[in-house]
Amino acid sequence: MGPRMALPRVLLLLFLHLLLLGCRSHPLGGAGLASELPGIQELLDRLRDRVSELQAERTDLEPLRQDRGLTEAWEAREAAPTGVLGPRSSIFQVLRGIRSPKTMRDSGCFGRRLDRIGSLSGLGCNVLRRY
């Protein structure tokens, strides 16, 4: 056995030895885990307590939120003057419809959709810039 063959064999044996050292079993019930178990259990108990507190607060606040929303809606309806044009007034809706670009009148050359394209690009007849 020459020196050229001895070096690769020694390296191979060293590699196999190191590889087998890493293949040993590592059971989960070691001493390190047993010392951490009470701390983990305490954290879990605190988390459960906190979740139950938050759920109790949530169930207590839900009826209050619903009652507050109903009373605010009722007060807003009572506070709205009857003679002033509101957002649901029919006259207000008609005026809003005249101003909206969807209901622009035809330009005479194109239909409604092309008039809308023409107003953006400058194409078409009688293009009026309303914006």
UniProtKB/Swiss-Prot annotation:
Gene Ontology CC annotation, any one: extracellular space
Site (Cleavage): R96, G97, R99, S100, P101, K102, T103
BP-aspect Gene Ontology terms: blood vessel diameter maintenance; cGMP biosynthetic process; cGMP-mediated signaling; negative regulation of systemic arterial blood pressure; neuropeptide signaling pathway; protein folding; receptor guanylyl cyclase signaling pathway
Protein location: Secreted
Database matches in PANTHER family: ATRIAL NATRIURETIC FACTOR PRECURSOR, NATRIURETIC PEPTIDES B
Family to which the UniProt record says this protein belongs: Belongs to the natriuretic peptide family.
The name this protein goes by in its record: Natriuretic peptides B
Recorded name of the encoding gene: NPPB
